[in-house]
Amino acid sequence: MAYKNFKFDVDADGIALVTWDIPDRSMNVFDEISTQEIGEIIKQTTSDPAIKGVVITSAKEAFCAGADLSMLEGMNRSYAQLFKEKGEEAANQMLFEQSRQMSQSFRAIETSGKPWVAAINGLALGGGFEITLACHYRVAAENPKTRLGLPEIKVGLFPGAGGTQRVPRLVQPADAMQLLLKGEAVNLTRAKALNLIHAVVPAADLIKAAKDWIKGGGKAVAPWDEKGFKLPGGPVFSKMGMQMFPAGNAIYRRETYDNYPAARAIMSCVYEGLQLPIDAALRVESRYFTKVLRSKEAAAMIRSLFLSMQELNKGARRPAGVPPTKVKKLAVIGAGFMGASVGYVSAQAGIDVVLVDRDLESADKGKGHAKTVVDGLIAKGRMKQDAADAILARISATSDYNVISDCDLVIEAVFEDRKVKADTYAKAQPLLKPGAIFASNTSTLPINSLAEEFKDQGKFIGIHFFSPVEKMMLVEIILGKNTGDVALATALDYVRAIGKTPIVVNDSRGFFANRCVMRYISEGNEMLLEGVPPAMIENTAKMAGMPVGPLSLQDEVALDLGLKITKATEADLGPNAIDQAQKKLMVEMVEKQGRFGRKNGKGFYDYPEKGKGQKSLWPGLANLQPKQLDPDTLSVEELKQRFLVVQAVEAARTVEDRVITDVREADVGSILGFGFAPFTGGALSYIDFMGTKNFVALCHSFEKKYGSRFTPPKLLEEMAAKGETFYGRFPPKKQAA
């Protein structure tokens, strides 16, 4: 029988080799065809007495990247349609049956009576890893890049094809929960130590090793189907179980604040499933998976963190008609922390980099940052010396501007001062080669005003990185009014080449991300001045889904920098453009108290010397509050909502102002750029899933109590009146360049 996505061969020993190779895709995924065909292959191999065993592998570099989440979106659409036609019970049953097809197929592998071997030749994630767990033997090809894992939690789901039941039956409970709840992939050494795979062999011997295991009498029985099987950590109701599950629940609550239905479902699946035989446990898993799949959190996270991000990473915003560009050599002018970091990630991606600064000592210091980073990675076993040497060899440092004359892209990363930037542009412009693109990494100064110092404004663009550059995945590309398509295409191609996710925004003070995050910071300061206890401010922000509290965030950014930005905004736009009470607070903190944040060991928090305890809120904050409110009189829910609403309403303003022209970018940008509660799907999805009518009503409620910062823009009022959503009114274009 011929298959579309699999090659099927049987050798003289009766061993079937099933090779996964989806046409016209760089990676295998479980789409509808693959799911259907693997079911047919299982039936064929089980029923054919001539077949003695099965080896499943991949013809691609990776084994399988997991389920095609757009297939799950289709299931949800079918659910919604059936719900309308036949009601909730029929729709739930349909979703349950559809969502457990993979789980049933994988169980059929285990119980087929024929030995199955997973010959893992590369990356295996999600459903791609779950099918290997259902095989009776797992052998992997030696490859330091191979990772195995179950990352579904990162898009609001959990492993629904047996992962929550097989992993804790193979692995010690604490390790199993880490794999499931964090969604982090492990290398082969770690996977073997955890008992997730049985063997690692040279790539050339992979298929032979798999077949040899079958020919050597490999048993076609899963461990949990054998009589006398014992869980690695003992029964749930045992001393170890009682130590693990209560502590696990506490850790889960601490990390998620119960905002993620999938995380709660994982805890329940494992706890309930380990008390049952495997078949009943798999049904429990499928029930929970069906429930989570219907949740707004899963729908929002799948849309933003998988579908939208994938589309943006593939170049959804790239202008049509511009040939592909490649930055072979990059100049970074300004080798401070930000510039040095940009240089490092570029060199890591294979781009030759020259760091330019006012003197050689400063430029060399920038290159030294790259050495510090690679030395740290080597010490942690995450980079080989030869790879580190290659990165460092691609970075040169100089004080001579003439070196930029053969660069394809020049990024300015000097101090946030108009005069300093203007001087830099004056030096650089005469040296640029024809066709070179010039970008500013400014984080606050409008691109249009900076472009006035540039003769060919068509080749001038903003490329705003977020700190720390090595970790932050978002890059804002800012268009000036005269920025050309080639400049935009070059910027997008470069950002994609260094493995970051780009969003394209129009010029505005603070662009998109800083406009929204400054609202978050300001709301924290407002609460402080209202008399809300500082600890309550920080904790309710994290309960709302933010990664760090607003006071802690200011310490990380640096309070003196925040004050400089405030003063610059006031100088440019006048005294009404800033909150004078907040300025007074920051003047007190920085100029009178000398508290700059983490960098000098004291800000809103006190920071002990390394290794001498944890940071703690500065007791002196109480003296800066005009009054102090009793926490028992405050609504935790209202404080949480204030943090999210004030950011979301600003995101809506950026759409009205045409700073954001693609709603996907607001959602992806808000999550990757400043950690806006990921379970909401992003700032605009937060509004959409709440309903624009409800959101506007909440805005007006807060507006009456707290002021005009909560006033919804006219666009939102209009959308609420019509019952529109952002994704309905501004449907994204799906094409990618």
Residues covered by each model-derived region:
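Short, active-site-adjacent cap segments at secondary-structure transitions
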Residues: E61-A65, L125-G126, I404, L445-P446
